[in-house]
Amino acid sequence: RLVPKEADKYGFVLWVDEQSHLLLRVDMVDKEGNLVEQVLGVDLDRQPAPAPWLVTLARSKLPDALALEDAYPAPQQTLSWHLTWLPGGFKVLSQDRHQLVSTSLPVDYMMLSDGVVDLSVYVSRVDPKQAVRQQLIRQGATSLVSFVNEVGVEITVVGEVPTETAKRIAESVQPLARNEAVQ
């Protein structure tokens, strides 16, 4: 059982086979212990020996696995926004500006992680008259919070955290002062 110290993250209940040490089930639970999402193995077919292709793969020279910091080097682009609050353990792993495929509009993007959960934060200018004022959606463990602030900036946070946490992160997005460094 992995129990978060704060209520701004989900907890995990891990079910591991005692003999094989394989992960059989993962329950993601909220602060009250209610099931939010579950991943479950339903069938395991153990073989006396590995398949030939697996033996070949095991003998292959493969590149070393990348650490998160190497896969997503620290902020690549300076954005005009920063976060004034993050849940404990989270940090910005990557950030950039790109165009959304669906609208061709530019969006500032930040990828956050605590090593277990990844979150995406999108910030873009929109016409406040045409934008949806606020959206709060949760499907399983994934929350999506999106709102347009008073100056016509749409802020969207997506990830496997409670909706209240996603909302608090979105509300913490602030413009950088001209001479302020990126966090």
Name each region found by the language model:
Residues 166-182:
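Short, low-complexity, Pro/Ser/Thr/Gly-rich segments in the mature regions of secreted, periplasmic
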Residues 10-12, 37, 108, 117, ...:
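Envelope-exposed proteins and targeting segments
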Residues 47-78, 177-183:
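Short, gly/Ser/Thr-rich active-site loops of penicillin-recognizing serine hydrolases
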Residues 2, 119-121, 155-157:
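Hydrophobic beta-strand residues in large extracellular and virion-surface proteins
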Residues 1-62, 136-137:
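Gly/Pro-enriched, hydrophobic low-complexity segments
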Residues 24-26, 151-160:
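Short, well-ordered beta-strand elements
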Residues 61-151, 161-164, 168:
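Short, solvent-exposed recognition patches
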